[in-house]
Swiss-Prot record:
The keyword Transmembrane helix applies. Forms a complex with TatC. It is a single-pass membrane protein. Part of the twin-arginine translocation (Tat) system that transports large folded proteins containing a characteristic twin-arginine motif in their signal peptide across membranes. TatA could form the protein-conducting channel of the Tat system. One of its GO terms (biological process) is protein transport by the Tat complex. The chain crosses the membrane at residues 1-21. It comes from the Bacteria. It comes from Alkaliphilus metalliredigens (strain QYMF). PANTHER family: SEC-INDEPENDENT PROTEIN TRANSLOCASE PROTEIN TATA. This is Sec-independent protein translocase protein TatA. The gene is tatA. One of its GO terms (molecular function) is protein transmembrane transporter activity. It is found in: Cell membrane. One of its GO terms (cellular component) is TAT protein transport complex.
Length: 69
């Protein structure tokens, strides 16, 4: 999920975020980041499903045209 980020890099990112935002804001930021990622994944899945449906409909139309000829 994080690509080539290892544990030391993640700890450094967390430490910098802790210094910048403080311990009281960090849970709120994490929650909001989690919601954003969830929404992005949901949107991405919906787009993929829509494209798959559109592709199937196009294939069905092409099949009907071939059968009519």
């Amino acid at each position: 999920m994080f690509g080539k980020l290892g544990m030391p890099e993640l700890v450094l990112i967390f430490a910098v975020a802790l210094v910048i935002f403080g311990p009281s804001k960090l849970p709120e930021i994490g929650k909001s980041l989690g919601k954003s990622i969830k929404e992005f994944k949901k949107f991405s899945k919906e787009m993929k499903d829509d494209l798959s449906l559109e592709e199937r409909e196009t294939k069905d139309k092409d099949t009907v045209k071939v059968k009519e000829e």
